[in-house]
Amino acid sequence: MSLESEESEVDLVGGAVLPGTLPEVLRAELVAFRRDLHMHPELGNQEFRTTAAIKERLERAGLAPRVLSSGTGVICDIGVMDGTPVGTGPDTGTGPDTGTGAAPGTGILALRADIDGLPIPDMKSECPYRSTVPDRAHACGHDVHTTVVLGTGLVLAELHRQGLLPRPVRLIFQPAEEVLPGGAADALLDGALDGVGRIVAVHCDPRVDAGRIGLREGPITSACDRLEIALDGPGGHTARPHLTTDLVTAAARVVTDVPALVGRRVDSRSGLAITWGRVESGHAPNVIPQHAELSGTVRCLDLETWRLAPDIVVAAIDEVANLHRAKSEINYVRGVPPVVNEAGVTELLRDAMIARRGAESVENTEQSLGGEDFSWYLEHVPGAMARLGVRPPGERTIRDLHQGDFDVDEHAITVGVELFTAAALL
């Protein structure tokens, strides 16, 4: 791939060389690559086809990608001499053990993408690139994230060959973001942050128009944990609930009363929210069941509340279950802390987007209650995540994340590549 074409002019912005419009041949290739991923979604830690496709394309560009020891996911360096990270310094993080990071502001710039799909059916009935895998879909935009980082890698590899890459860059294609506590731990244990000084990522946002990004300094996502509860009782006849444990009522009370109790035991400004995704019990209308199961998520806005949440939530569940004479077994699964965008890296992304598309292409965004394991990287090095607009301009209908009809305006791929390329060059 060459960037030398009528459509690849260069601009000088703040002394940095920035490639202009991506060559049409590369834009078309990236769209085709994304559509291929979209048609073949793979769940967390099962992304073997996706991993092979990423590795093959990077090798074809003359790079030396390596697959994570877990078997899926890829790490690939550009401009790192002899494979030795530069600017290595001590790691001071508090998340999963990572190995070594660089001192802030030095070392490698890492670009991270997640590569896994979701266990939901693709509901786009007349889409030529809809999922070909039953009950599997790329409904969170990870196919786009992957393509953006891949495309950026191809551009930066060419610029490196031309002597125009001012700093080393690492591409991180991470598996299993959708699986708590996230596949970031595998990437970190495989040295994803060795020598890294800063890290950036994007996440598709169907509420932001394609051609724009959303940015926010400080927390941009929330902490997210998983909650699994089993309730047990002797069961009995629905004619005599007073002689047994009415397990359906007990489960219903857990659903309604636990969030209310928890809401009175933490600061309301913390935004702690419990939302249930599954409640199951019973098989007959006239039989009080002996067993019930509930599962859901616990989300909160700040790190301090996240640290307190397990004890508070578990105590509230026990209280409600005991009140209804139900035995409770609680599995509180730790998930991820909030993604907290560091000021300097947030400004880097802002400057990069403005350099490519003007000040009007950046909008301020609110903190989301969604969880993202990108946060684990930020426990060790400064970084930031931008919301990549994927809504067709003028479109009123929002095809939301984690819904079977989710899709994107594929112009967002070009925008993401331009953003990351400019960030690497500024």
Feature-to-residue mapping (PLM):
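Non-cysteine beta-strand/loop elements that form the S-adenosyl-L-methionine
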Residues: 110-112, 121, 227-229, 385-391
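Acidic/His- and Gly-rich active-site-bordering loop/insert found
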Residues: 3-138, 143, 147, 151-167
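Histidine/acidic-residue-rich, glycine-tolerant segments that coordinate divalent metal ions
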Residues: 83, 117-137, 143-144, 159-289, ...
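General structural feature for long, well-ordered alpha-helical segments within catalytic domains
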Residues: 26-33, 46, 50-57, 107, ...
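A structural signal for isolated positions on well-ordered beta-strands in alpha/beta enzyme cores
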Residues: 66, 170-172, 329
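Metal-dependent amide/peptide-bond hydrolase catalytic core
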Residues: 2-7, 252-426
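Divalent metal-coordination and catalytic microenvironments
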Residues: 37, 58, 111, 142, ...
